[in-house]
A protein has these predicted regions:
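Membrane-embedded alpha-helical bundles that constitute the cytochrome b-like, heme-associated redox core
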Residues: 1-149
Length: 149
């Protein structure tokens, strides 16, 4: 499998599992949310691994002061995504413990998990919008191409 195809597959699966993780899990089950969230975490880690060279190069350029404004904003959003989703993932795993004890109710960790997940989702939307040219390129959409009627 080539690199471009791997990127597309990982990104599509990550988005699918991310959307599924926002399904009202009370209607399905906590186990469903935990499994889907864990799968999303796996694809998130794969996404970072696949793009590690870009991350390293842009980080180096950022600290050297060599980034243009647009790339600097992409980098800021990407780093916010990394921090917010890392907190969401960590608090998601910590929040499992009170759920094992039904009397404990929703913990501070569960609330923090929910808040960071929603912030993370908003940042994902911004991230996708910022990277639309690359996404279109991966999907083979030509710039200025019009659909045939």
């Amino acid at each position: 499998m080539n690199s471009r195809r791997a990127k597309i597959i990982v990104d599509i699966l990550m988005v699918i599992f991310l959307v599924l993780s926002f399904v009202r899990w009370e209607a399905s089950s906590f186990a469903f949310h935990a499994i889907v969230g864990s799968a999303c975490t796996l694809f998130f880690a794969m996404h970072i691994f696949i793009h590690r060279k870009w991350i390293k190069a842009v980080t180096k350029s950022c600290f050297a002061g060599k980034l243009n404004k647009a790339l600097r904003w992409k980098y800021i959003i990407d780093m916010l995504l990394l921090v917010v989703w890392s907190v969401s993932i960590l608090t998601g795993f910590i929040a499992i413990i009170p759920f094992l004890d039904e009397a404990a109710g929703i913990s501070v960790w569960g609330r923090l998990h929910g808040i960071t997940a929603r912030i993370g989702l908003a940042l994902v939307v911004v991230h996708v919008i910022q990277h639309l040219p690359q996404i279109k390129s991966y999907l083979g959409v030509k710039k200025g191409a019009k659909k045939k009627s």
